[in-house]
Amino acid sequence: MVADTAGWADGDRRQIEDLGFRGGDSRGEALRTLDLTIADDGTPTRVLDAPAMAALNSHHARFAERRGDVVRYQTDVSVWTGIPAQPTPQDWEDVRALLGSGGMLGVGAAAVLPEGWELVEGAGGVQLTGEAIEGVPDAEAVLLTPDDVPEMTALVERTKPGPFLPRTIELGTYLGIRRDGRLVAMAGERLHPPGWTEISAVCTDEAYRGQGFGRRLVLAVAHGIRERGETPLMHAAAGNTGAIGLYQHLGFRLRDRGAPRFVRVP
């Protein structure tokens, strides 16, 4: 997740339109009535401090590649890597071996970087939890399958919601909306730590934005998550305050932990 710090970014506008809101000409106008404060984290959500690690040690263990105490998703599934909260020198060497020079990973606030490792400037994320989200099924949302991956990949390439790899669909349920047989919007499940499921890849074709497809799909995916007794979770680029505020408008709340810093392997 790369933060945009240059005012009202294309990514902000794109995600706002995906969710079906029209926010005027300025970020302030779009978010005037929304609460962007970080909620007090009084719920038992510690597993979310390291969601990739938790997922790869539970529901997603079949996708894991390990070296010592460092674990990552298989490279055609997801870009996420799990690392201990307070990495040892050996952990950093294991990261280097797994990711290679130039690889990037998120680390928690407690991680002390070894000499020569630097934070990626302008990169960071926020985490939002959906304890108040019940979700709403959507009769128009269709279940996407591996046969749809080429079309899903093309939609992601056009809309840039974040990485979507050849086997990302295996991580969970993906729903889409079609017009004249063509996939024009989608959202689905990614990280799956115990008790939680992340909603990701929320995107809408440019020609169909502003119609609420993104909002409907987020709520439809959330409904499925709730049906199996789990709680929805989302991540967003720290600079994308437009999307963050609108996810809050749907009922998500910002956590005071769980936002990674990003590091590039030297």
Question: What annotation goes with each model-predicted range?
Answer:
Residues A30-D49, E131-G162:
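Short amphipathic alpha-helix that is part of the acyltransferase structural core
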Residues V107-A111, G224, L233-I244, P260-P266:
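Conserved beta-strand-loop-alpha-helix junction that forms the acyl-donor binding cleft
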Residues T5, E17-G24, G28-L113:
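N-terminal charged segments
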Residues P163-T173, R178-C203:
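A conserved beta-strand-loop-helix scaffold within acyl/acetyltransferase catalytic domains
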Residues T81-P87, V202-R209, A237:
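A short, internal acetyl-CoA/4′-phosphopantetheine-binding micro-motif in the GNAT/acyltransferase core
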Residues V112-W117, R215, A238-D256:
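Conserved active-site alpha-helix within GNAT-family acetyltransferase domains
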Residues Q90-D94, G210-G224, I244-G245, H249:
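Conserved acetyl-CoA-binding loop-helix of GNAT-fold acetyltransferases
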Residues E118-G130, H235, R253-P266:
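Conserved catalytic-core motifs of GNAT/GCN5-like acyltransferases
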